[in-house]
Design a protein with these regions (language model features):
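Conserved strand-helix element at the start of the C-terminal RecA-like helicase core
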Residues: 265-276, 443-466, 476
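Walker A/P-loop
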Residues: 239-260
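C-terminal accessory region of SF2 helicases/translocases
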Residues: 2, 536, 542-760
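Post-DEXD/H (motif II) to motif III coupling segment of the RecA-like Helicase ATP-binding lobe
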Residues: 346-355, 361-415
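Accessory nucleic-acid engagement/destabilization modules that flank
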Residues: 2-212
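Conserved Walker A/P-loop ATP-binding site and its immediately adjacent core
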Residues: 265-287, 297-300, 395-397
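Interdomain hinge/linker at the junction between the two RecA-like core domains of SF2 helicases
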Residues: 395-443
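Conserved RecA-like helicase motor core of SF1/SF2 enzymes
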Residues: 83-86, 480-483, 487, 501-549, ...
Length: 760
């Protein structure tokens, strides 16, 4: 018997057949989309993929590999002089009989790399490795040929008499974008990853392929007697094209994207998890009731569990496998492929036959926008479809997409702005601190939102307002609350905005693009124009309130974070344009005015010489020069998360959970270790303990905050937790303040020092 897996026990034939079943599912669901992406005859493409699947794990016949499984399932090991120190995927291509399989010489490299790298290892193929593999082929693998034929029943003819390591020469240089068969390679190798991962997880590779989100969205419109707006009709008419769509807040961009997606597999991205969660709820259960969507970000499991979604673990696993029909995701989960990390082809091949929606592109840093633009270029070249939706589109990004050939006959671009004027803007020649009394007075009769640029500034403003009048309904929200408290506060601000409450909320730009809230008045520190206009969108959102007097106040003096968070030159240029618009036109700013100003301030002419421009161009240069497979998946993901951060529990919170969650986690570690030491292992009990440990770790993570590592480096405020499995969680030696007051959460969160003054 030749084994492939130990838990659950699975023979090589069973595992390979499971892959072939997923291949058929993929072909039936999206075969027509996949077939047009390569220059091969469609039947030949599927034949090659079937060959790769059949051969991918033949190297597992290697005796030491079989012994690893035999030991785990309680079977006697086979005598062998070899160690299990050569990966099975490096052996599998040895069996391919190219002549019998009628594989052209120029496709050998594609086939060998698709099989040989279906598990990615950071291994250099040198002469020592080649010699070692040849010895294994001669002294071990050749003796297994009959077993493969009799036990595995190979579907295709294999090499039997002489197994040579010559195929390794096809693995020495990775296939690059400029190579002739690059597209074919991406599709074959990428889909091999997908098929293998789904079969190994015993999950279907594609789910609910017939559930059309466009139909669900139009049904929602019909049931509520809504007509399709012009923007939605535009998307419907251009379903077969790529789209760049500029539309103001409240135009129905989400529904527009869903109508464009229609019956295609799709991925919908947004900058922040909280906004993705809200959108996922709207589409899954609140409005559209499309219950076939996945949610994919670093805390999606917690969110689905906390919000009582059934089968939440299955849903997250399916999203990670990219199996869901529609997936709501942060870009770090699905947009790593421009780094061409080891294994990037899985992501790239999947996006190639899907539609991808990028919402609010202007909300990302210039470096991340460079990654998105590089990714859009790659998707365009391979034949995939994208939609960029944004309220404001910096001209520098459009120009770069034009340079990269993305603006072609298959691209539709339109701007849809509402004629409703929602904001009467006053630029104050003072600091926010100088106008706190007016803010308090407004808070006694209106919903007032105060947005500042840093956590430190938010906390200071909160304290000062509290000292002026402790009776006003005063609330604080920023990123330095532990996860579970931040979720509660985010829910509180959403509820506050919905009901008849009056009072004041002080926040950072956390609220800009993430929370769907509507206030009467906005007071904000100056920032870049795109950021300011995002903030405007949290005031008089629907344009139903009178704006005879100013409802937006911008404070241009002593604003925090200028030069550290926001580029000083871009802030000043934007402020200059805004003041010209107010003085020469009107303080009642239209949506067209906003778009025009952002395009001007982010034109290449204006940006040259700024740090923003330098970061954007440098990032593109690095991406363009990258060689395939230099980075690992984790390294690519870390770059996309924009910042290296420490996940830490504030010391006071840690002291409260030290003898509960932390102790329980330690106890579970010990129980699992003991179970591994037993001769008669109870696999079910071990599985239960591991599941419980994972659950406890999720509870511990809810007690953490994320702090940029560079902010706390060398300050001595971070301490390790010396427990196996919790090494990546730290203790933060700062106070934590939050208490419940008459059913409301009150407090500053992590009480930070001057060293974190510019933290957002």
């Amino acid at each position: 018997m030749i084994y492939a897996k130990s838990n659950p026990k699975e023979t090589l034939r069973e595992h390979t057949d499971a892959l072939r079943k997923e291949l058929e599912t993929l072909k039936n669901c999206y075969g027509d989309k996949i077939e047009i992406l390569t220059n091969l005859d469609k039947e030949e493409f599927w034949r090659l993929l079937d060959i790769i699947v059949e051969f991918h794990d033949l190297g597992k016949v290697f005796t030491p590999f079989q012994n690893v499984i035999r030991e785990k399932i309680g079977e006697k090991k086979i005598d062998t002089p070899f160690e299990n120190d050569i990966y099975h995927n490096f052996i599998s291509p040895a069996f391919i009989n190219y002549k019998k399989l009628n594989i052209d010489k120029d496709l050998k490299e594609v086939i060998v790399q698709s099989i040989g790298y279906h598990h990615e290892r950071d291994v250099i193929i040198d002469n020592d490795l080649k010699d070692k593999i040849q010895k294994i082929l001669d002294e071990d693998i050749l003796n297994q040929v009959n077993k493969l034929k009799d036990d595995f029943h190979v579907k295709y003819e294999i090499k039997e008499k002489s197994l040579r390591n010559t195929y390794l020469k096809y693995m020495e240089k990775r296939i690059k974008p400029k190579d002739e068969n690059y597209k074919l390679y991406v599709m074959l190798k990428g889909l091999t990853h997908r098929i293998d991962h789904s079969a190994s997880a015993h999950e279907e590779i594609e789910l609910n392929a017939d559930e059309n989100v466009g139909e669900y969205t139009e049904r929602f419109f019909k049931n509520n007697n809504y007509e399709l707006r012009e923007v939605q009709q535009f998307a419907k008419n251009n379903r077969n094209k790529n789209i760049i769509l500029k539309a103001s807040t409240g135009m129905g961009k989400t529904e527009t994207a869903l109508i464009w997606i229609d019956n295609d597999k799709s991925f919908f991205t947004l900058p922040l998890r909280v906004s993705i969660n809200a959108l996922f709820d709207r589409v899954s259960k609140d409005d559209i009731k499309y219950n076939y969507a996945g949610l994919l970000h670093s805390s999606s499991l917690d969110y689905l569990e906390d919000n009582k979604y059934s089968d939440y673990e299955d849903r997250v696993n399916q999203s990670r496998l990219m199996s869901t029909k529609l997936t709501f995701s942060t870009i770090d989960q699905i947009f790593k492929f421009p780094f061409m990390y080891r294994g990037y082809e899985k992501e790239f091949a999947t996006l190639a036959y899907s539609k991808i929606v990028i919402d609010e592109i202007q909300a990302y840093s210039p470096e991340i926008c460079a990654v998105l633009i590089k990714g859009i270029e790659m998707i365009h070249k391979i034949g995939g479809n994208f939609m960029i939706m944004t309220a404001t589109m910096p001209a520098i990004y459009e120009n770069e997409l034009k340079r990269r050939g993305v603006f072609d006959d298959n691209l539709a671009t339109r701007t849809f702005n509402t004629d409703i004027i929602r904001h009467n803007v006053k630029v104050e020649d003072m600091s926010l601190d100088e106008n706190l009394n007016q803010i308090v007075e407004q808070g006694k009769s209106k919903k007032v939102l105060v947005i500042v640029n840093t956590v430190k500034s938010a906390v200071d403003t909160y304290e000062k307002l509290k000292n002026i009048n402790d009776n006003v309904n005063l609330n604080l929200l920023h990123s330095m609350y532990i996860q579970e408290d931040r979720v509660k506060l985010e829910n509180n601000i959403k509820e506050f905005a919905k009901n008849e409450n009056i009072g004041i909320w002080i926040t950072t730009q956390l609220v800009e693009a993430s929370l769907d809230v509507d206030f009467d008045v906005l007071h904000t520190e100056v920032s870049t124009l795109d950021s300011l206009f995002q903030r405007f969108g949290r005031c008089n959102r629907k344009g139903l309130k009178l704006i005879d007097s100013p409802n937006v106040f911008i404070y241009k003096k002593e604003a925090n974070g200028i030069g550290s968070i926001y580029d000083k030159d871009i802030v000043n240029k934007g402020l200059e344009l805004l003041e010209i618009c107010i003085n020469e036109k009107s303080s009642k700013i239209t949506e067209d005015d906003k778009l025009e100003m952002v395009e001007k301030v982010y034109s290449e002419e204006n940006l040259k010489g700024t740090e923003f421009y330098s970061k954007f161009r440098k990032a593109l240069e690095i991406l363009d020069a990258l060689e395939p497979c230099q980075l690992s998946k984790n390294e690519a993901q870390s770059i996309l998360r924009d910042i290296e951060s420490d996940t830490a529990i504030p010391i006071e919170v840690y002291e409260k959970i030290k003898y509960t969650y932390i102790k329980f986690y330690e106890d579970l570690n010990e129980l699992i270790d003991n179970e591994y030491k037993k001769e008669n292992k109870n696999d079910e009990y071990k599985k239960y303990l591991k599941s419980k440990r994972k659950e406890v770790k999720r509870d511990i993570l809810k007690k953490t905050v994320n702090i940029p590592a560079y902010r706390t480096k060398n300050l001595g405020v971070i301490t390790d937790i010396p427990i196996k499995g919790l090494e990546n969680i730290k203790i933060l030696n700062y106070k934590y303040e939050l208490q419940e007051d008459n059913g409301r959460l009150k407090g500053k969160g992590v009480v930070i020092g001057e060293e974190l003054i510019n933290f957002v």
